[in-house]
Amino acid sequence: VSVLSADQFRSIVNEKGTAAQKALLGTANTNWQDVIYQTAHMTDNNLSIGGEVAKLPYRISLGFQTQSGVLKTDKLQRTSVALSLNPTFFNNHLKVDLSLKGSLQKSRFANLGAIGAAVSFDPTQPVYATVNPQRFGGYFEWLDRNSPTGLMNLAGRNPLGMLEQRYDEGTPQRSIGNIQFDYKFHFLPELRANLNLGYDVSKGEGTVYVSDSSAIGYVVGGKGGTNNIYKQTKQNTLLEFYLNYVKDLRFLKSRVDVMAGYSYNNYLTTNYNYASYTASGEKYPNTDPAFPFDKPENTLISFFGRANYAVNNRYFLTAT
Protein backbone atom coordinates (compact mmCIF):
# COMPACT_ATOMS: atom_id res chain seq x y z
CA VAL A 1 0.00 0.00 0.00
CA SER A 2 1.38 3.41 -0.93
CA VAL A 3 1.93 5.56 2.16
CA LEU A 4 3.87 8.70 3.04
CA SER A 5 7.56 8.33 3.72
CA ALA A 6 8.93 9.60 7.01
CA ASP A 7 10.26 12.79 5.38
CA GLN A 8 6.94 13.44 3.62
CA PHE A 9 5.05 12.88 6.86
CA ARG A 10 7.35 15.23 8.79
CA SER A 11 6.99 17.88 6.10
CA ILE A 12 3.19 17.85 6.26
CA VAL A 13 3.07 17.91 10.07
CA ASN A 14 5.62 20.74 10.25
CA GLU A 15 3.66 22.70 7.68
CA LYS A 16 0.12 22.19 8.96
CA GLY A 17 0.32 20.60 12.41
CA THR A 18 -0.03 22.16 15.85
CA ALA A 19 2.88 22.62 18.22
CA ALA A 20 1.75 19.56 20.18
CA GLN A 21 1.63 17.45 17.02
CA LYS A 22 5.06 18.63 15.91
CA ALA A 23 6.46 17.66 19.31
CA LEU A 24 5.41 14.04 18.70
CA LEU A 25 7.50 13.68 15.55
CA GLY A 26 10.47 11.36 15.71
CA THR A 27 13.75 11.30 13.83
CA ALA A 28 13.59 7.76 12.43
CA ASN A 29 12.80 6.73 8.86
CA THR A 30 10.81 3.53 9.21
CA ASN A 31 8.92 1.79 6.44
CA TRP A 32 6.61 -0.28 8.60
CA GLN A 33 5.48 -2.46 5.72
CA ASP A 34 9.10 -3.44 5.06
CA VAL A 35 9.39 -4.23 8.77
CA ILE A 36 6.50 -6.70 8.89
CA TYR A 37 6.83 -8.35 5.46
CA GLN A 38 9.48 -10.81 4.32
CA THR A 39 10.40 -12.92 1.32
CA ALA A 40 8.51 -16.19 1.64
CA HIS A 41 10.43 -19.45 1.23
CA MET A 42 9.10 -22.94 0.67
CA THR A 43 10.48 -26.46 0.38
CA ASP A 44 8.31 -29.31 -0.87
CA ASN A 45 9.75 -32.84 -0.89
CA ASN A 46 7.88 -35.89 -2.17
CA LEU A 47 8.74 -39.58 -2.49
CA SER A 48 6.50 -42.05 -4.33
CA ILE A 49 6.86 -45.82 -4.60
CA GLY A 50 4.64 -48.00 -6.76
CA GLY A 51 4.54 -51.59 -7.81
CA GLU A 52 2.76 -54.90 -7.36
CA VAL A 53 2.99 -57.49 -4.58
CA ALA A 54 1.22 -60.84 -5.02
CA LYS A 55 -0.84 -59.34 -7.88
CA LEU A 56 -1.83 -56.42 -5.66
CA PRO A 57 -1.04 -53.06 -7.29
CA TYR A 58 -0.02 -50.40 -4.79
CA ARG A 59 1.31 -46.88 -4.58
CA ILE A 60 2.73 -45.11 -1.52
CA SER A 61 3.59 -41.42 -1.35
CA LEU A 62 5.33 -39.45 1.38
CA GLY A 63 5.58 -35.68 1.53
CA PHE A 64 7.21 -33.05 3.70
CA GLN A 65 6.63 -29.34 3.21
CA THR A 66 7.86 -26.22 4.99
CA GLN A 67 6.66 -22.76 4.12
CA SER A 68 7.00 -19.28 5.55
CA GLY A 69 4.46 -16.57 4.86
CA VAL A 70 5.06 -13.11 3.45
CA LEU A 71 3.98 -11.80 6.86
CA LYS A 72 6.65 -12.37 9.50
CA THR A 73 5.98 -15.17 12.05
CA ASP A 74 3.58 -16.88 9.61
CA LYS A 75 4.83 -20.40 8.88
CA LEU A 76 3.80 -24.03 8.53
CA GLN A 77 5.31 -27.49 8.46
CA ARG A 78 3.31 -30.35 6.95
CA THR A 79 3.93 -34.09 6.76
CA SER A 80 1.68 -36.18 4.53
CA VAL A 81 1.28 -39.81 3.50
CA ALA A 82 -0.92 -41.46 0.88
CA LEU A 83 -1.68 -45.10 0.08
CA SER A 84 -3.49 -46.49 -2.95
CA LEU A 85 -4.45 -50.15 -3.57
CA ASN A 86 -6.23 -51.42 -6.71
CA PRO A 87 -6.83 -55.19 -6.53
CA THR A 88 -9.20 -57.19 -8.75
CA PHE A 89 -11.03 -60.43 -7.94
CA PHE A 90 -13.16 -63.11 -9.60
CA ASN A 91 -11.49 -62.89 -12.99
CA ASN A 92 -11.76 -59.08 -13.06
CA HIS A 93 -15.47 -59.09 -12.25
CA LEU A 94 -14.82 -57.27 -8.96
CA LYS A 95 -12.58 -54.21 -8.92
CA VAL A 96 -11.60 -52.52 -5.68
CA ASP A 97 -10.03 -49.07 -5.40
CA LEU A 98 -8.77 -48.07 -1.97
CA SER A 99 -7.29 -44.64 -1.28
CA LEU A 100 -6.07 -43.29 2.06
CA LYS A 101 -4.47 -39.92 2.76
CA GLY A 102 -3.30 -38.33 5.98
CA SER A 103 -1.56 -35.12 6.93
CA LEU A 104 -0.17 -33.58 10.10
CA GLN A 105 0.55 -29.88 10.14
CA LYS A 106 2.23 -27.57 12.62
CA SER A 107 1.50 -23.90 12.04
CA ARG A 108 2.07 -20.51 13.54
CA PHE A 109 -0.51 -17.97 12.39
CA ALA A 110 0.58 -14.35 12.12
CA ASN A 111 -1.42 -11.54 13.72
CA LEU A 112 -3.21 -10.06 10.69
CA GLY A 113 -3.93 -6.88 12.64
CA ALA A 114 -0.32 -5.92 12.01
CA ILE A 115 -1.13 -5.28 8.33
CA GLY A 116 -3.43 -2.37 9.07
CA ALA A 117 -1.19 -1.15 11.87
CA ALA A 118 1.79 -0.96 9.49
CA VAL A 119 -0.15 1.23 7.08
CA SER A 120 -1.17 3.74 9.76
CA PHE A 121 1.78 3.77 12.20
CA ASP A 122 4.01 6.85 12.42
CA PRO A 123 7.00 6.38 10.03
CA THR A 124 9.09 8.87 12.03
CA GLN A 125 9.27 6.48 15.01
CA PRO A 126 11.82 3.66 15.46
CA VAL A 127 11.01 -0.03 15.66
CA TYR A 128 12.58 -0.40 19.10
CA ALA A 129 12.27 1.96 22.04
CA THR A 130 15.13 4.26 23.00
CA VAL A 131 13.36 5.43 26.19
CA ASN A 132 12.48 2.78 28.77
CA PRO A 133 13.52 -0.04 26.40
CA GLN A 134 12.80 -2.63 29.09
CA ARG A 135 9.06 -1.97 28.84
CA PHE A 136 6.64 -3.69 26.44
CA GLY A 137 9.23 -6.09 25.10
CA GLY A 138 11.56 -3.32 23.99
CA TYR A 139 9.32 -2.20 21.12
CA PHE A 140 8.49 1.45 20.59
CA GLU A 141 4.99 2.25 21.80
CA TRP A 142 3.10 5.49 22.29
CA LEU A 143 3.28 6.35 26.00
CA ASP A 144 1.06 8.51 28.18
CA ARG A 145 2.14 9.41 31.70
CA ASN A 146 -1.45 10.08 32.69
CA SER A 147 -2.73 6.68 31.58
CA PRO A 148 -2.98 3.92 34.22
CA THR A 149 -1.23 1.50 31.84
CA GLY A 150 1.35 4.03 30.71
CA LEU A 151 0.13 3.54 27.12
CA MET A 152 -1.69 6.05 24.96
CA ASN A 153 -5.09 4.37 24.72
CA LEU A 154 -6.19 5.54 21.27
CA ALA A 155 -2.82 5.13 19.58
CA GLY A 156 -1.95 2.20 17.36
CA ARG A 157 0.41 -0.50 18.56
CA ASN A 158 3.83 -1.35 17.20
CA PRO A 159 3.23 -3.58 14.13
CA LEU A 160 6.30 -5.76 14.68
CA GLY A 161 5.46 -6.11 18.36
CA MET A 162 1.98 -7.27 17.38
CA LEU A 163 3.56 -10.05 15.33
CA GLU A 164 6.40 -11.18 17.55
CA GLN A 165 4.55 -10.99 20.87
CA ARG A 166 1.54 -13.05 19.81
CA TYR A 167 1.90 -16.83 19.48
CA ASP A 168 -1.04 -18.43 17.71
CA GLU A 169 0.11 -21.99 17.14
CA GLY A 170 -1.98 -24.90 15.95
CA THR A 171 -1.67 -28.51 14.83
CA PRO A 172 -4.28 -29.26 12.13
CA GLN A 173 -4.68 -32.95 11.30
CA ARG A 174 -6.65 -34.49 8.46
CA SER A 175 -7.45 -37.95 7.17
CA ILE A 176 -9.27 -38.76 3.92
CA GLY A 177 -10.30 -42.25 2.91
CA ASN A 178 -12.25 -43.80 0.07
CA ILE A 179 -13.00 -47.34 -1.03
CA GLN A 180 -14.98 -48.23 -4.13
CA PHE A 181 -16.29 -51.66 -5.16
CA ASP A 182 -17.35 -52.19 -8.75
CA TYR A 183 -18.89 -55.61 -9.46
CA LYS A 184 -19.88 -56.96 -12.88
CA PHE A 185 -22.39 -59.77 -12.39
CA HIS A 186 -21.30 -63.18 -13.67
CA PHE A 187 -24.75 -64.22 -14.83
CA LEU A 188 -25.54 -60.81 -16.34
CA PRO A 189 -22.33 -59.00 -17.35
CA GLU A 190 -24.31 -56.01 -18.65
CA LEU A 191 -25.29 -55.23 -15.03
CA ARG A 192 -22.85 -53.56 -12.64
CA ALA A 193 -23.17 -52.73 -8.96
CA ASN A 194 -21.06 -49.92 -7.55
CA LEU A 195 -20.57 -49.11 -3.87
CA ASN A 196 -18.57 -46.06 -2.83
CA LEU A 197 -17.67 -45.36 0.82
CA GLY A 198 -15.69 -42.35 1.94
CA TYR A 199 -14.79 -40.14 4.84
CA ASP A 200 -13.01 -36.84 5.47
CA VAL A 201 -12.07 -36.20 9.10
CA SER A 202 -10.08 -33.24 10.37
CA LYS A 203 -9.14 -31.79 13.73
CA GLY A 204 -7.67 -28.41 14.52
CA GLU A 205 -6.47 -27.40 17.95
CA GLY A 206 -4.00 -24.91 19.30
CA THR A 207 -3.20 -22.09 21.69
CA VAL A 208 -3.08 -18.32 21.52
CA TYR A 209 -0.52 -16.78 23.87
CA VAL A 210 0.13 -13.07 24.35
CA SER A 211 2.58 -11.98 27.03
CA ASP A 212 1.19 -9.77 29.79
CA SER A 213 4.18 -7.46 29.28
CA SER A 214 3.32 -6.72 25.65
CA ALA A 215 1.42 -3.58 24.71
CA ILE A 216 -1.40 -5.58 23.11
CA GLY A 217 -1.91 -7.61 26.30
CA TYR A 218 -0.92 -5.23 29.07
CA VAL A 219 -3.25 -4.30 31.92
CA VAL A 220 -2.66 -2.32 35.10
CA GLY A 221 -0.88 -4.38 37.73
CA GLY A 222 -0.13 -7.27 35.41
CA LYS A 223 -2.34 -10.37 35.17
CA GLY A 224 -3.14 -9.55 31.58
CA GLY A 225 -2.27 -11.08 28.26
CA THR A 226 -3.82 -14.19 26.77
CA ASN A 227 -3.33 -17.92 27.18
CA ASN A 228 -6.31 -19.54 25.46
CA ILE A 229 -6.90 -22.87 23.76
CA TYR A 230 -9.17 -23.71 20.85
CA LYS A 231 -10.36 -26.89 19.17
CA GLN A 232 -12.61 -27.90 16.29
CA THR A 233 -13.35 -31.21 14.59
CA LYS A 234 -15.05 -31.88 11.25
CA GLN A 235 -16.41 -35.15 9.95
CA ASN A 236 -17.79 -35.83 6.48
CA THR A 237 -19.02 -39.33 5.61
CA LEU A 238 -20.31 -40.62 2.28
CA LEU A 239 -22.18 -43.73 1.17
CA GLU A 240 -23.21 -44.09 -2.45
CA PHE A 241 -24.63 -47.14 -4.21
CA TYR A 242 -25.98 -47.59 -7.70
CA LEU A 243 -26.87 -50.27 -10.25
CA ASN A 244 -26.02 -49.69 -13.89
CA TYR A 245 -27.34 -51.75 -16.80
CA VAL A 246 -25.84 -51.20 -20.26
CA LYS A 247 -26.94 -53.28 -23.25
CA ASP A 248 -26.23 -52.95 -26.96
CA LEU A 249 -29.24 -54.00 -29.07
CA ARG A 250 -27.49 -54.62 -32.35
CA PHE A 251 -30.56 -55.77 -34.23
CA LEU A 252 -32.14 -52.38 -33.44
CA LYS A 253 -28.88 -50.48 -33.83
CA SER A 254 -29.53 -49.02 -30.40
CA ARG A 255 -28.09 -48.91 -26.90
CA VAL A 256 -29.80 -48.92 -23.50
CA ASP A 257 -28.14 -47.39 -20.42
CA VAL A 258 -30.14 -47.41 -17.17
CA MET A 259 -28.90 -46.44 -13.71
CA ALA A 260 -30.57 -46.16 -10.29
CA GLY A 261 -28.94 -45.38 -6.98
CA TYR A 262 -28.90 -43.98 -3.47
CA SER A 263 -26.58 -41.42 -1.84
CA TYR A 264 -26.05 -40.48 1.81
CA ASN A 265 -23.76 -37.62 2.85
CA ASN A 266 -23.34 -36.39 6.43
CA TYR A 267 -21.48 -33.27 7.61
CA LEU A 268 -20.77 -32.86 11.32
CA THR A 269 -18.75 -30.06 12.92
CA THR A 270 -17.92 -29.84 16.63
CA ASN A 271 -16.81 -26.46 17.98
CA TYR A 272 -15.40 -26.59 21.49
CA ASN A 273 -15.89 -23.55 23.71
CA TYR A 274 -13.50 -22.58 26.49
CA ALA A 275 -13.10 -19.83 29.05
CA SER A 276 -10.49 -17.09 28.55
CA TYR A 277 -7.27 -17.04 30.58
CA THR A 278 -4.50 -14.59 31.35
CA ALA A 279 -0.93 -15.22 30.24
CA SER A 280 -0.19 -16.70 33.67
CA GLY A 281 -3.15 -19.09 33.42
CA GLU A 282 -5.70 -17.33 35.63
CA LYS A 283 -9.26 -17.39 34.37
CA TYR A 284 -10.78 -14.07 33.38
CA PRO A 285 -14.06 -13.44 35.24
CA ASN A 286 -17.36 -14.16 33.49
CA THR A 287 -15.79 -15.96 30.51
CA ASP A 288 -17.12 -19.47 31.11
CA PRO A 289 -19.06 -20.57 28.01
CA ALA A 290 -22.76 -21.29 28.28
CA PHE A 291 -22.18 -24.62 26.51
CA PRO A 292 -18.97 -26.68 26.33
CA PHE A 293 -19.46 -27.28 22.61
CA ASP A 294 -21.89 -26.93 19.73
CA LYS A 295 -22.39 -29.47 16.94
CA PRO A 296 -23.98 -28.20 13.74
CA GLU A 297 -24.88 -31.11 11.46
CA ASN A 298 -26.28 -31.48 7.96
CA THR A 299 -27.34 -34.64 6.15
CA LEU A 300 -28.07 -34.99 2.45
CA ILE A 301 -29.98 -38.07 1.24
CA SER A 302 -30.67 -38.63 -2.43
CA PHE A 303 -32.34 -41.21 -4.64
CA PHE A 304 -31.45 -40.88 -8.28
CA GLY A 305 -32.13 -42.56 -11.57
CA ARG A 306 -31.25 -42.10 -15.21
CA ALA A 307 -32.20 -43.80 -18.47
CA ASN A 308 -30.55 -43.25 -21.85
CA TYR A 309 -31.68 -44.73 -25.14
CA ALA A 310 -29.57 -44.17 -28.26
CA VAL A 311 -30.47 -45.15 -31.83
CA ASN A 312 -27.79 -45.55 -34.46
CA ASN A 313 -25.56 -43.35 -32.32
CA ARG A 314 -27.45 -40.34 -33.69
CA TYR A 315 -30.72 -40.06 -31.81
CA PHE A 316 -30.78 -39.89 -28.02
CA LEU A 317 -33.56 -40.05 -25.47
CA THR A 318 -32.72 -39.29 -21.83
CA ALA A 319 -34.85 -39.37 -18.68
CA THR A 320 -33.65 -38.53 -15.16
Where on the chain are the PLM-derived regions?
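Surface-exposed loop/interface segments of Gram-negative outer-membrane beta-barrel transport/assembly proteins
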Residues: 1-28, 70-74, 80-176, 194-302
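Periplasmic N-terminal accessory/gating domains of Gram-negative outer-membrane beta-barrel systems
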Residues: 29-40
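Predominantly transmembrane beta-strands of Gram-negative outer membrane beta-barrel pores used
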Residues: 36-37, 44-66, 70, 82-88, ...
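Short secondary-structure boundary/capping elements
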Residues: 41, 295-299, 307
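Residues on the lipid-exposed face of transmembrane beta-strands in outer-membrane beta-barrel proteins
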Residues: 47-51, 83-87, 177-183, 241-245, ...
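Repeated loop/turn-to-beta-strand initiation elements of outer-membrane beta-barrel proteins
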Residues: 55-58, 92-96, 188-191, 314-317
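Exposed, low-structure sequence patches enriched in small/polar residues
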Residues: 196, 261, 304-312, 316-320
